[in-house]
Amino acid sequence: MKKTIILALVLAFVLTGLGLGQAQKPSDIKFPSLTYNPPDPAAFKTPFANGLRGYVQEDRTLPLINISAHINFGGLYLSKDKQGLDTLMSGTLIQGGTKTKEGPAIQERLDFLGGSLSFNVAERTSTLTLSVLSKDLDEGLTLFFDVLMNPEFREGPLNLAKARVLQQLRQANDQPSGVLSREYEKVLYGDHPLTWQPTKATYDGITGADLKAVHAKYFFPKNIILSAAGDFAKADLKAKIDKFVAPWKNKDLALPAFSKAFHSPEPGVYFIQMPTNQGYIDIGHLGLEDTNPDYYAVQIMNFILGGGSFSSRITSKVRSTEGLSYNQGSRFTYRWGFPGVFSGYVQTKSSTVGYAISLIQDEFNRIRKEPVGDAELETAIAYYLESFANSFESAQGTMSSFANLEMTGKPMTYYKTYRDKIRAVTKAKVQEVANKYVHPDKAVIMIVGDWDPSNKGGDKWPGPLDKLGKVHKLSLADPLTGEIGK
């Protein structure tokens, strides 16, 4: 009897699986088209008192509120002798307390509320972010604006921050990947605020008065954009924030102007000796700004070349076919107001350093000379179209994105037109931008690794490395002093 029941169940399962019209393979499955319209920044733009700008969205999903202040100040705005002040400000704006509260007291109160307050300084923007339960909004805003408007940068917390960053500075040359990133940009950008590095002397010379002076110069309502999302009534939040910022004084500020006249480094191999059994490699040159009209076609081109994980050409050749690496590809980085960097990259054992580089260079030349395939183009475009909605997964993330658009001067129609510009990319356009922005003959090949086995090569690509171009052996600076070793 039991066997009969089991047989009947199995037969029913099989017959169900053979139902008419069922897809026989995944590619046969048809999904309804996804229709998604991105939110319009204008619907969330909120002017506050005293020229403070903002983007605000009510989100009643959870009893939480997130608020960020995006300040037009970053490490690039510092003089050469004040390098590191941005890092110290990151570590002391909150911890250094305010005129009326010690840093530990602020943190203890946030812990009691189950909230958080964080601050970060990047190249050209700084961000102070508050997260609290909606029932604690009033106290959270009081702490948030007290820190934003009245930081004290007390000596004790400042000295602790200096001790932490000096320990990190001592370790700056320990990791090959960190050395590669830093030294590669130095070669590409030259002597420029983008590549200036702090030393022990610059850290030691920074005082609480210096931090207060920078705060006074850059932190005022018209130089800040707020983003906020959470469980609140928009009109109520606006009224509360207006009370905090109404007495805050504005000022005239001329932001620093930066040169875009970068030097042209000599193409070739730039080698940094480190006792490691792998070579850490970047191959490339300066790229473009993300305000360039070619940005969209470059994104598609790079996805095909090396940015598309396992579907990309570099990964397929270097990893899947040759088995040389688990970390390889290509990238275009972007920075506000400057050309970013184009790089092919790979980590591979010392004996295959030259071979891996030659394979990546082959792919650089191939994408310039040959039109990409129909399937490659379709896959790349589909990736950007299908992942587009991910940019708006969280309400606070969306508001912050809108604040960033305004801060960097991008058109507020950026998201509205994004997919149409991606769809418009053609095979001919991909080849055009490949020839315009990928230049193997101008590439800097930066290698961090062990010279002897890397230079010797292996069976498929015997050395020496000067077959790839003129070799420049670089010495690292002592991170504490900035002095170049011999």
Each language-model region and where it sits:
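Buried hydrophobic packing residues in well-ordered domains
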Residues: G51, A69, L85-M89, L110, ...
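M16/MPP (pitrilysin/insulinase) zinc-metallopeptidase core fold and M16-derived inactive scaffolds
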Residues: S68-S131, D174, P193-Q197, G308-L324, ...
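An aromatic/glycine/proline-enriched structural segment found at the starts
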Residues: Q24-F31, I225-E289, G449-K486
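Histidine-acidic residue clusters that define the catalytic metal-binding segment
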Residues: K25-K45, E185-I224, D252, P256-A261, ...
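M16/insulysin-pitrilysin zinc metalloprotease superfamily fold
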Residues: Q95-K101, L130-K162, G308-S309, G329, ...
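Bacterial N-terminal signal peptides
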Residues: A8-G17
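Acidic/histidine-enriched segments that form metal/cofactor-coordinating
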Residues: A23-P26, K30-F31, A105-V214, A257-K260, ...
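Short acidic/His-enriched helical or mixed secondary-structure segments at domain edges of catalytic enzymes
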Residues: R164-R182, K260, S264-G279, S316-S325, ...
